[in-house]
């Protein structure tokens, strides 16, 4: 679960390396975000000459969460670190590559572009 002040790694080549969640979108009092949810983030660490700079406020889609997710078949999937992909207002990725695996739950949330760019879908 991702909430305000949670630090996440960035799983794309947009130029950001680390971001912090400042808002969970989707409802007035929504507190937590999980895989596939859109959040508002602030860039805390970025590489030089990237598309985004430190201090930028952007949207991101959560692609990996540390807490385990239960699937309908009863299996549990969890990742080592929390990670997100920077997206624009139309929910299209800013970067051109995705690093690391992404869960297939993104397909149900209509993030097909992220699924197609990912090297592995679990």
From Swiss-Prot:
Q: What does this protein do?
A: Binds to 23S rRNA. Forms part of two intersubunit bridges in the 70S ribosome.
Q: Which UniProt keywords apply?
A: Ribonucleoprotein, Ribosomal protein, RNA-binding, rRNA-binding
Oligomeric form and interacting partners: Part of the 50S ribosomal subunit. Forms a cluster with proteins L3 and L19. In the 70S ribosome, L14 and L19 interact and together make contacts with the 16S rRNA in bridges B5 and B8.
Q: Which CDD domains match?
A: Ribosomal_uL14 (cd00337)
Q: Which gene encodes it?
A: rplN
Under the heading Pfam families, the entry gives: Ribosomal_L14
Originating organism: Caulobacter sp. (strain K31)
| UniProt similarity note | Belongs to the universal ribosomal protein uL14 family.
Biological process according to GO: translation
- Provide the protein name: Large ribosomal subunit protein uL14
